[in-house]
């Protein structure tokens, strides 16, 4: 009866991987069984934040862009590409995202993906980080 009512109401049952009451093993197995190979490989991709990418794209010379891997410039890649990959679930994390607005924007993109896997947002900071206004580093 419940299944019929759910079908009539147009509601879908929550996938196991989104059910917090299911065990971690059940959730992981369910999610992996739903993922395509492209999505699994995509979940190993980490990019720099879009604003970091834009800033380096305009502040570096052509030679620096071609030879400097420390600033994480991706030759031939556009912001549109990065947004599209995120919408398709082909990015798992971003580094150098400095504002909550950008972090929220990126998370909204990831929630448009088929499986809605949230992103990890990080910063590459060995000795602490004070990139956000008002932070204290100990």
Model region roles, listed by residue range:
Residues 1-13:
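Bacterial Sec-dependent N-terminal signal peptides
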Residues 10-138:
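N-terminal beta-rich core of secreted/periplasmic extracellular enzymes
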């Amino acid at each position: 009866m419940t299944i019929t009512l759910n079908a009539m109401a147009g509601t879908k049952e929550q996938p196991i991987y989104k059910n917090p009451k299911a065990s971690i093993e059940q959730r992981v197995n369910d999610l992996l069984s739903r993922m395509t190979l492209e999505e699994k490989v995509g979940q190993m991709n980490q990019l720099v934040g879009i604003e970091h990418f834009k800033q380096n794209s305009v502040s570096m010379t052509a030679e620096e862009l071609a030879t400097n891997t420390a600033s994480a410039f991706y030759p031939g890649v556009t912001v549109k590409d990065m947004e599209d990959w995120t919408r398709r679930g082909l990015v798992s994390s971003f580094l150098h995202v400095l504002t909550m607005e950008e972090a929220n924007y990126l998370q909204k993109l990831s929630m448009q993906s088929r499986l809605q896997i949230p992103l990890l947002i990080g910063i590459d900071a060995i000795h602490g980080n004070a990139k956000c206004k008002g932070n204290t580093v100990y």
